[in-house]
Amino acid sequence: MASDSSFPGASSNVAEYSVSEISGALKRTVEDTFGHVRVRGEISGYRGPHSSGHAYFALKDDRARLEAVIWRGSMSRLRFRPEEGMEVIATGKLTTYPGSSKYQIVIEQMEPAGAGALMALLEERKQRLAAEGLFDPALKQLLPFMPRVIGVVTSPTGAVIRDIIHRISDRYPLRVIVWPVRVQGDTCGPEVATAVNGFNTLPDDGPIPRPDVLIVARGGGSLEDLWGFNDEIVVRAVAASHIPVISAVGHETDWTLIDLAADMRAPTPTGAAEMAVPVKADLQASLASQSARLSSAMSRFFDQKRQAHRAAARAMPSADQLLALPRRRFDEAASRLTRALFVNTQKKRVHFDGHARQLSPRLLQRRLVELERGVTMLGQRLPRALEAFLRERRTAFTHRANRLSPEPILRRTRLTGSTLEQLDRRRDQAVRLLIERVKRRSQELDRLMRTLSYESVLERGFAVVFDAQGKPVKQAAAVSPGDALSVRFRDGDVGVVARAGLTIPDPTKGQ
């Protein structure tokens, strides 16, 4: 390479590098000098893994910033999920990126910078979610007493699921549906939230039944191991669940945010199974005890009612005592009824005799003769009256015809002739109707006369007694011993001689 002696220092022995050479030299120097380093800093700009699985962010403190990258393989081995603002200790190699003259750390391992940092982050998240009401006790749901299906969100290969299934089988065997998830690592939180939401979206009548209660379980571990159950998406999913949730994460001394959002917290996964289902043997014993108590109570109840019935029966008067007064009243009413019937019959007979005297056959016959005579007279007078009327009208027509022209007279004559024909027809019809009415009335009177006649009484099996003069005998007092009497029956008369009078017994006496 040519040198220009006009510039100062041009003849020195300083090596000359291209940009690529100096960048490569810097890269080798940094990597050789800082092989493995541990860097403490706060995560900044973290947006989660890229679609490739790698994660890009920065570590910073109050004076500097260091770009960082975690390749997919290392990302999957992390024991916790990185979050924005979390203070961590990253272990890895420093390197440079020649394309932009930047240096960065390629992280191979990363852990939270002590429990204090995680606890501070956890407390801040707890306060924020509590302010939203996600931990409100009023939102807690009651666990069903006897669930049919239990959903378990846990690892399918750990001892936790075996303990839960074994405990449920011992207490109250029922159907258990397991939704397998990772219970540690970067994907723990999203998988648990997906499982809780997935159980809630199951239809009641689908091929996979919808659980009546959920158990989210994991064994014990450090704060970093349990960090996935502090994830905000897990807390929101559990708080929004329409299915009651039991959290059983870690040991009794461990606590996570899911414990605050769940409807019930169990100290262990086995304890969660005990909370979820009752003991079948206890239920059977309780049922037997309740049945025995019910039988005993029913027996006592029936004994009390039986004793009360006996006491009431002893205090109740006998049937004869209860019926004595009504029976006496009935007997008195029966005795009065016979007399009342007799008196009423006598009154009705007197009333009937009065009407019968008013409607004697001779009176009816006389009335019938009068009606027939009236009808005959009307029949005789009507033709003469009509004839006189016609003669009068003809005379009037004749006088008028002499004074009027022929045409009007002819018209009026024709009209009058038509009127006369109508009058003739109406006369004939009126005479027929009158005669029919008189005949019907005569027939009715004749039937009434036959009905009221003593002969109809004879037809019904009675007899009429006549004295020697042929007059009917109406009272026994009018007959003396030795009088000759005639008894008329339906088919003839029989002569008899009266003996001493007999006293008619009073039907009301001797009752």
Curated annotation (Swiss-Prot):
Enzyme type, top EC level: hydrolase
Name of a matching Pfam family: tRNA_anti_2
Transmembrane keyword on record: no
One GO location term (cellular component): exodeoxyribonuclease VII complex
Localization: Cytoplasm
Superkingdom: Bacteria
EC id: 3.1.11.6
Tagged with keyword Acetylation: no
Keywords noted in UniProt: Cytoplasm, Exonuclease, Hydrolase, Nuclease
Family statement: Belongs to the XseA family.
Official protein name in the record: Exodeoxyribonuclease 7 large subunit
Organism field: Brucella melitensis biotype 1 (strain ATCC 23456 / CCUG 17765 / NCTC 10094 / 16M)
Gene symbol of the encoding locus: xseA
